Amino acid sequence: MKQLFATAVIALALAGCSSMEHKAAPGLTSNKSIEINAAPSAVWSIVKNFDGLNKWHPAFSKDVLTKGANGQVGAARAITLKDGPTFTEELTAYNDAKMMYSYKIIESPLPVDKYTSTMTVTPKGNGSVVTWVGNFITKAGSGKTDADSQGLIDGAYQAGLDNVKKMAEGK
């Protein structure tokens, strides 16, 4: 009986492994945060507008609402990178009182897929912490590795957060 049980457990484990080969990668996460010597409300005022990414992120030249309004779940924006490509994102959650919002990419030239992201501003001492967390997978057929995708998103988040800090601290 013990041998039958052990055989069944091994068979189930092997079946699970072979079926996992056909599933998408479990996903990647970028989690960046930065401490800022400014009140949370001041920092939130910089990042809260869904059509304001180009005002605080140095990589973007344009951000236009194409559907809905700022702070309205379902709003969509077209954002343009400084080197030209444009993509579309949709606001999936927004809470002004909690200083947070979430969004997802609808269409993008980036080598990532199933991208969702959340930005929050929280108090810390006399200042704030801005946290930007994204989940995604590497787009099939993009020719990029998971490390490439991770590096791209990590770099984008860090560049944005560094600039928010400069703006909020007046440097």
Spell out what each predicted region is.
Residues 81-129, 135-137, 167:
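Hydrophobic-ligand binding "helix-grip"
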